[in-house]
Amino acid sequence: MNDDIIILLSVFCGIFFICFIICSSIALYLWKSKSRKRLVEQYTKEAKQAKKQILANGYKEISEAKMLFLKRSELEKNELDRVKEQLELRSNDLKRNQEIVESKSQRLDASLLDLEKRKFLLDKKEEYLIKVLEDASSLTKSQAKELLIKQVKNKSEKELISILKNAELQAHSNSKMIANNIIISAMERIKVELTSQRTTNIVKLPSDDLKGRIIGKDGRNMKAFKQIGGVDIVIDETPNTVVVSSFNPIRREIATRTLEQLIIDGRIQPVKIENELKKQEQELEYIIQETGLSTIKELNINDIDIELVKLIGKLKFRTSYGQNVLAHSIEVAKLSGAIASELGLDVEKAIRAGLLHDIGKAIDFEKQGSHVVLGAEIAKKYNEDPIVINCIESHHEDKEKESEIAAIVAIADSISASRPGARYNAIDEFILRMTEIEKIGNSIPGVAKTYALQSGRQIRLIVDPLVASDLDLAMILEKMKEEIKNKVIIPGEITITVIRERKETDVLK
């Protein structure tokens, strides 16, 4: 009995559990169905709202596009109306002009008819008068015409000869006046400093006490300047002053700069002098280049070889008849440019030719040949314009002038050279004499350098110790004496000194 009850309870519990599971599943299903329904409703609601928003935005964009289209259409319509109105105005103007032209044409036609009638009447009257004249003069028309032409011709020839003579005199007077005006106008526009070259430089001293140090023990410092620098150091009673003397302006400038630097440094001795001379020589090369660059910049000259620029700078240290060649060349360049401007010619080419016309003087003391020939060679070497080359070749009438610019440069050169005080022949002759002495010395075998000092009355021959021995010094001295007697005229006594010095330098580490 108890077992049956247990079995029944077990069966009942199983059935209850199954029913519970089924009910739970049904409840869960119903709950999920409701949740899904709510989600569907929510998504549907959001989709409807999005649809409404999209439609609203679409309507708004369509409305804006429509408004924009209407405004654009209205503007285009207004523009078309304006163009149409302008075309109508132009059309009306053309119609009025056409009417005016037609009216003028009608008046011209009427005038032509009237002129033809008058011409016909005049021809008739002319025939009548000719007939009357022929009857009165017993000459035909052709005979009277020939007589009249002959009389007029004779009278015209006399008047023409008189007119031509007067015109020739007037043209000659005007051409001379115009030429003078051109040159005067060019000279008025040019301002160039007058520079006369000296053969000495003055060095100011802080005190006279330095003179003894400059002289050195037994005069060795002054000897060093003579032997190495090729200049004379002149010390006299003038207070606080030392004079550097040399006909060669480049050597004089190097020595002056050297002495000034040594005075600042305070150490004045032969070795220091030699080193400083070499240093100042290098610095002067830089100054020469800078001078050339500043010159072409001043004259606004472009596209020029740097080596040619250096030669231009070198002219600063060259003189001709006492006139500084660079200053003279700049003056000729400016005068040439001004005259070319007055005549309507190429100003830049005239300035360039004027500057380079004496470029041969930058090397004529180093090479054989006239400055004209050397200058033309330099210009050809650096590919200058043929007109510029001809200006160099013809400014002293060595060659025929091939252009107006060549004539202008020659005129400007003459103006610059002929100014009062521009040139001094005595100085140039002195420099030529000194140059000739140095050339003679340098031509002797074994001589490395020659220095002409004190107007040529002292000559220093520096011998190359590797080429000439002590035994050769007497022979070199005799050779120099003989050459000087035959080729150079110098009044008074001449002292010739031959110096052979050899130095050995080594560095001990």
From Swiss-Prot:
Endoribonuclease that initiates mRNA decay. Its EC number is 3.1.-.-. It is found in: Cell membrane. Belongs to the RNase Y family. The keyword RNA-binding applies. One of its GO terms (cellular component) is plasma membrane. CDD domains: HDc, KH-I_RNaseY. It is a single-pass membrane protein. HAMAP family: RNase_Y. The chain crosses the membrane at residues 5-25. Residues 325-418 form the HD domain. GO terms for molecular function: RNA binding; RNA endonuclease activity. InterPro entries: Diverse_Catalytic_Enzymes (IPR051094), HD/PDEase_dom (IPR003607), HD_domain (IPR006674), HDIG_dom (IPR006675), KH_dom (IPR004087), KH_dom_type_1 (IPR004088), KH_dom_type_1_sf (IPR036612), Ribonuclease_Y (IPR017705). This is Ribonuclease Y. Residues 199-259 form the KH domain. Gene3D superfamilies: Hypothetical protein af1432. GO terms for biological process: mRNA catabolic process. The lineage of its organism: Bacteria, Bacillati, Mycoplasmatota, Mollicutes, Mycoplasmataceae. Keywords: Cell membrane, Endonuclease, Hydrolase, Membrane, Nuclease, RNA-binding, Transmembrane, Transmembrane helix. The keyword Cytoplasm does not apply.
